[in-house]
Swiss-Prot record:
Classification of source organism: Eukaryota, Metazoa, Chordata, Craniata, Vertebrata
Ranges for domain VWFA: 484-681, 923-1094
Signal peptide: none
Region feature (Disordered): 1-25, 701-734
Superkingdom: Eukaryota
Keyword ATP-binding in annotation: no
Matches recorded under SMART domains: VWA
Keyword annotations: Repeat
Protein name in the entry: von Willebrand factor A domain-containing protein 3A
Length: 1148
């Protein structure tokens, strides 16, 4: 027991000047009382209250709270604070020992503050040893039960002194309480009142008279007094004044008090008054320590005085005096020696402190807020109503509407059918409208050019908006737009490592976005709910500062009671939500809520209905929770967590914002802007298509005219001269027109049979090249219906059957790709999207081997090879027969395919799939090697196994079981169990207690796993060769396989042991399973940019050589697609070069 001796001189001086000094010592901002604000009937009570006003605040003030607000740490007067104010320098390059330099002003200021603090502590200690506080200590609580030991009360000076001290206690401290219950105890108990009484002048006077009538009794029956006082449940503080040793043992009293106060908040205060010879102080001190109470000892004869409040102040004073001496030594001694001692002391101090003290803090983290006045922000949806493409009349359909015409269809009575009008292809371009119909568009290039310039300016505005949304507090919270706001902070125990991050995020919000709001409040929630204010308060500079100081004291504890926090906000802060507009709740959380998502969604949908109130979720991702001996209350992967909160926000008509260390993962505000940018790009591409269609028509005209001029004249001279028949009659004209029409169609078809690219310009026919003609199917001949018109002998005709149009080569730009998160093997996944199946081979764009490059016939080379760009592949020259548009379409498709491959690869390397691969079967058993060699990896494996349970087994499997094997087998369950939430929680607890030891008995584990009924897949995780023969295991599995047909998937922690790797490969292949090996951190860091970005760039490195089957098959297909994409980009550059040369020749 710590003892401290203090001056025992009684100080009963109540001089007003001294009382004023006491107020100053306590740093109390107490305004002067020049009159009573409330008038009472009893004037005597008013006078007594005024007389005790000067001591009221001091008496009510708790010593722990006072020391917390005036400690060295709170005042920034610790060793670490001193060193942080210095400057670290290296005097020369060879000396690696840093020196810390302090300015004279810094040292003097620090010394001055330390001296003032020491003086404050000494004044506080003097105050604690005055009047009743010296004899009985500082009484806590507002409803006090007072037990007075009357066993040693006797006549004489001691009795008079004890009565005076009790009277002083009544006047100075008990008069400030709300209720009192007093009794004396000896052999029997003598209560003053039957029940606790309200404190008033009459009750205090009655108590003083009762104290003077106390009579001594023989023994001290404390137990009977405790039974009497604990019957009154409303008391929150119990003061026991002992003058002799109790009759009962301290252990018996401690057990009784603990049982009686179970579920109640009662503070125990034990005081021994001048009885150190009769009562062992150590026994009572241990008793109060066990009860979490307060022990006070007072004995002026032996100069013994023990007070915990004074002891704590003395310890803090000694720290301050020691630090002051070190600061003074800095001015005279070698700074480096002093600093080395300081650093050692800091290390010891940090080791003793809380774990959160080790967390790094931003600069000026605890400084007052620097409040800014923001603009009136809007959500992206509201902002786009003013600045969107439709609002700015920049929709492509709005621009094309004046020049868009519907195709005309009318019923022709004479034909008894509906006839559709046709237009010449040069005049208009057919274009698909937003409603799915097709319209004829008159293309005006200057208008479209100006429109694309306006689109570019709009996209720049949207990009600026995206950048603005990604800065400062908007990166964390999004835009806080409502006028009445409540902030919900997640301070569950899983966020203990991130409490500084949570506080800093709140600081940014308070500084940048809340100063222009009307009302606000902050609610912190873990298992319990803690609110800054009972209800919302008006936004002001002082309130924002107070809220920040409150947030600095938040501690993480408990689980994540999201429903309780929402109920507090909705039912208390927004109890009048139907009477106000522009109201919002911002939930800042880092994990899955304790309650079921459907329950939360149903609650917010009902609570938020019919009022202008929104729930916005700000989810920060801090990584998968680490597995230890205490599993989390509720578990979900980050994707499931995000999905859950998105469902909740949709039910509450709010917005979802998800960010992490690398940036913003998902945001409704950002998605709205990105969608508008994509719409603008889509409009721009359609404009380019319209202009390209118009240019293609013009180029075809020019090329056809040029070909007519370049036709050899010898061809015309060799044609026989035609003999024209005599003028026919009208029916003959009709029949000949049919014949001429058919001949014309036949000749046009013959021209189309020449061997040249379909989309290229037409080539002149060369005689003697019959082998170049292509065989085609006979085309449908047109059929005419002839009739005489009403105008004389004229003949009319209409087509009854039309000729088939020429087939146009198209690149399928609307390819269908599977989802990246499809639960299947890579072999099944790539079977639906491999390049060959999608018909994306690049060889289709190349013609046959060019035979004219080495030919002596110059004209053929000039007329054929100059029209098509050529490229040399493996020593052979081949022509590129695709147009630039077709090549662009192919590149777009390939980029889409490679992006899909990258997203699938990222999915396979994320979550539990990185270690375990993809679980395919519905009924599975996980076999985990827990031999001694697995010790270094066991903690990581346990964390990933918990993630596997919730991410794959819970969602995709019907039943599962876990089995660990070393020398012996350890089963989680005897059979496969359904993957319910309760079963997953039990599995987590089982995983938490796994330990690594012993050998590797793979055969016994597989034999046991094959015995499970209805099991479909086994997943074997190990790090090396088994203890038994590999061939024996393979033969055994093969025999089991013939009977059961269970697939065995193997997982190797390392690929260094090639023998073990080959064994696991063969074991998986034997049963039709897959082999998997997790990717190392080094290999993963090399492709991190590719996976995060989602698409490839030229500078991206090649994929590493994956060992696992799923990753290897996908990587092979990705590499093949990447090579084709690079080759297509080379071909595009050749086509661009050829087109540029053509344009130069045309301009000349």
């Amino acid at each position: 027991m710590k003892k401290c001796r203090w001056s025992m001189d009684r100080n009963t001086d109540r001089d007003p000047q001294k009382q004023e000094n006491k107020k100053t010592m306590n740093d109390l901002a107490q305004t002067s009382q020049d009159g009573l604000l409330v008038t009472h009937v009893n004037q005597t009570q008013d006078l007594l209250q005024l007389q005790g006003r000067e001591t009221q605040t001091s008496a009510l003030e708790d010593s722990e709270d006072w020391l917390a607000m005036h400690s060295l740490k709170f005042e920034k007067l610790t060793l670490a604070d001193l060193i942080s104010q210095g400057t670290v320098e290296l005097e020369d390059c060879n000396n690696a020992v840093p020196k810390v330099h302090f300015t004279t002003q810094t040292i003097h200021h620090f010394k001055s503050r330390l001296s003032d603090t020491i003086e404050l502590y000494q004044q506080r200690m003097r105050w604690l040893t005055e009047n009743s506080k010296k004899a009985f200590g500082l009484i806590k609580g507002s409803r006090v039960g007072l037990l007075i030991d009357s066993s040693q009360v006797s006549s004489g000076s001691q009795t008079k002194e004890f009565q005076n001290d009790l009277t002083g206690l009544i006047d100075e401290q008990l008069s400030l309480k709300e209720k009192l219950y007093v009794l004396s105890f000896g052999v029997t108990i003598n209560p003053l009142w039957p029940d606790p009484m309200e404190v008033s002048t009459s009750t205090l006077q009655e108590l003083k008279l009762w104290v003077k009538t106390l009579q001594p009794e023989g023994s001290s029956n404390l137990l009977q007094a405790l039974k009497k006082v604990f019957a009154h449940k409303e008391l929150n503080s119990l003061v026991i004044i002992l003058r002799s040793c109790p009759d009962q043992p301290s252990e018996f009293l401690s057990d009784f008090i603990q049982q009686s106060t179970l579920g109640r908040s009662v503070f125990i205060h034990v005081t021994t008054y001048k009885c150190d010879d009769h009562v062992p102080s150590a026994v009572l001190k241990n008793l109060t320590d066990a009860l979490g109470g307060y022990y006070h000892c007072y004995s002026p004869e032996s100069e013994l005085y023990t007070s915990r409040d004074v002891v704590e102040l003395q310890v803090e004073t000694h720290k301050a005096q020691g630090l002051l001496s070190q600061v003074q030594a800095l001015c005279h001694n070698n700074p480096c020696e002093e600093l080395s001692c300081m650093i050692k002391e800091i290390s010891i101090e940090i080791a003793k402190g809380p774990f959160t003290s080790l967390l790094p803090k931003p600069p000026k983290h605890e400084a007052p807020l620097t409040i800014k006045f923001p603009d009136l922000d809007k959500t992206s949806a509201e902002w786009l109503k003013i600045n969107g493409l439709k609002a700015k009349k920049l929709s492509l359909y709005q621009v094309l509407a004046p020049n868009a015409f519907n195709p005309v269809e009318e019923f022709v009575p004479i034909l008894q059918k509906t006839v559709a009008a046709t237009i010449h292809e040069k005049a208009m371009v057919q274009f698909e409208w937003h409603d799915g119909t097709v319209k004829n568009i008159h293309v005006d290039p200057p208008v479209l050019f100006e429109y694309q310039k306006q689109l570019g300016k709009a996209v720049q505005i949207y990009e600026h908006r995206l950048q603005w949304l990604s800065l400062t507090s908007r990166r964390i919270w999004g835009t806080v737009c409502q006028r009445r706001v409540v902030i919900l902070l997640d301070v569950s125990v899983t966020n203990s490592m991130y409490i500084i991050h949570i506080q800093h995020s709140l600081r940014l919000l308070l500084e940048e976005q809340l100063s222009n709001k009307d009302y606000f409040n902050i609610i912190a929630f873990g298992s319990t709910i803690e609110s800054w204010r009972p209800e919302m308060v008006a936004v002001s500079h002082d309130n924002l500062q107070r809220a920040w100081r409150w947030a600095l004291g938040l501690q993480c504890q408990g689980s994540r009671n999201v429903l309780g926090a929402l109920r507090k906000a909705i039912e208390v802060d927004f109890k009048d939500k139907n009477k106000h507009e522009s109201q919002g709740i911002y939930l800042f959380t880092g994990g899955i809520p304790d309650q079921d998502v459907h329950i939360l969604s149903a609650y917010v949908a009902e609570a938020y209905g019919g009022c202008d109130l929104q729930l916005n979720v700000c989810l920060f991702y801090v990584g998968e929770p680490q597995m230890d001996t205490t599993p989390p209350a509720c578990y979900a992967s980050r994707t499931d967590t995000a999905t859950a909160y998105k469902e909740i926000t949709q039910a509450a008509r709010g917005r979802f914002h998800w960010f992490g260390e690398t940036g913003i993962y998902e945001s409704d505000d950002i998605n709205a802007i990105v969608s508008e940018i994509e719409k603008a790009l889509n409009y721009s591409q359609k404009c380019a298509f319209l202009v390209a269609s118009l240019k293609n028509h013009s180029e075809k005209e020019l090329q056809s005219g040029a070909l007519e001029k370049d036709k050899p004249r010898t061809l015309k001279q060799s044609q026989p001269k035609k003999h024209y028949p005599p003028k026919p009659t009208a029916p003959s004209v009709a029949r000949m027109s049919i014949k001429d029409g058919l001949d014309g169609e036949t000749s046009s078809r013959l021209k189309a049979l020449k061997c040249h690219p379909v989309n290229a310009a037409a080539q002149p026919e060369k005689e003697g090249t019959v082998e170049q003609r292509m065989k085609t199917k006979p085309r449908t001949r047109p059929k005419l219906f002839l009739f005489y018109t009403e105008a004389g002998n004229s003949v009319g005709s209409v087509y009854k059957r039309y000729t088939q149009g020429k087939s146009i080569r198209r690149i399928n730009s609307s390819i269908q790709l599977p989802r990246k998160d499809t639960v299947c093997s890579s072999q099944e996944w790539t079977a639906t999207c491999r390049l060959k199946r999608l018909k994306l081979e690049l060889s289709k764009c190349l013609g046959p081997n060019c035979r004219y490059q080495k030919s002596v016939r110059g004209p053929a080379l000039a007329e054929h090879c100059t029209l098509f760009p050529s490229i040399e592949i493996n020593g052979v020259v081949r022509h590129i027969q695709w147009t630039l548009w077709e090549m662009e379409t192919y590149i777009t498709c390939m980029e889409k395919v490679t992006r899909c491959y990258v997203q699938r690869l990222h999915w396979l390397l994320s979550g539990s799939r990185r270690l375990f691969g993809t679980i395919l079967e519905r009924n599975v058993c996980i076999l985990l090697d827990t031999s001694g060699s697995m010790g270094p990896h066991l903690q990581w494996i346990k964390t990933e196994l918990v993630l596997l349970i919730w991410e794959q087994l819970r969602k995709h499997c019907a039943r599962f079981n876990l089995l660990s094997f070393a020398e012996d087998l350890q089963l989680w369950q005897d059979t496969l169990v359904e993957s319910t939430e309760a079963a997953c929680h039990k599995a987590m607890q089982w995983v938490a207690h796994l330990q690594a030891q012993g050998s590797t008995s793979v055969l016994a584990a597989l034999t046991k796993a094959f015995s499970f009924q209805d099991v479909q897949g086994l997943y074997l995780l190990t790090d090396g060769k088994p203890d038994t023969s590999c061939s024996l295991i393979l033969n055994t599995v093969q025999s089991f396989q013939k009977e059961r047909g269970v697939k065995v998937h193997t997982i190797s922690l390392t690929s260094a042991d090639r023998t073990a790797t080959e064994f696991l490969r063969e074991l998986a292949s034997l049963s039709g399973g897959r082999y998997h090996c997790p990717v190392s951190d080094k290999a993963l860091s090399g492709i991190q940019g590719l996976l995060t970005r989602g698409f490839i760039k030229e500078r991206d490195p090649k994929l590493p050589l994956f060992e696992g089957d799923d990753l290897r098959l996908l990587a092979e297909e990705f590499t093949r697609a990447r090579n084709l994409l690079k080759q297509a980009q080379v071909f595009r550059s050749q086509l661009l070069k050829k087109n540029n040369m053509k344009s130069k020749v045309t301009s000349c």
